[in-house]
A protein has these predicted regions:
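An N-terminal amphipathic alpha-helical segment
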Residues: 1-26
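Intrinsically disordered, low-complexity terminal tails/loops enriched in metal-binding residues
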Residues: 2-3, 49-50, 71
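Sterically constrained small-residue positions within well-ordered secondary structures
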Residues: 25, 45, 56-58
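Short, structured protein-protein interaction patches enriched in aromatics and acidic/basic residues
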Residues: 33-53
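C-terminal edge-of-domain segments
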Residues: 55-72
Length: 72
């Protein structure tokens, strides 16, 4: 089951901090589904370095970012 996190109403750097905290709490096989009002480009670089993959969907102001470990 995916873990849901909505950071769309938060101001920087809180969205990044909450997303990183939630990633650390993921259980094996679990993915993180994030609702965000913008594309967090600094996060994408961090995810690659951490060994995670991501997929984005949506449009300006309403994005959904799905995050999971590379090996899954």
């Amino acid at each position: 089951m995916d873990k849901e996190l909505d950071v769309s109403d938060l101001e920087p750097p809180e969205p990044l901090e909450r997303i990183l905290d939630a990633i650390m709490e993921l259980r094996p096989g679990q993915r993180l589904a994030v609702s965000h009002r913008r594309l967090p480009y600094p996060l994408f670089d961090m995810l690659r370095r951490m060994g995670h993959r991501y997929e984005t969907t949506g449009e300006e102001g309403r994005y959904r970012i799905l995050i999971w470990p590379s090996g899954e």
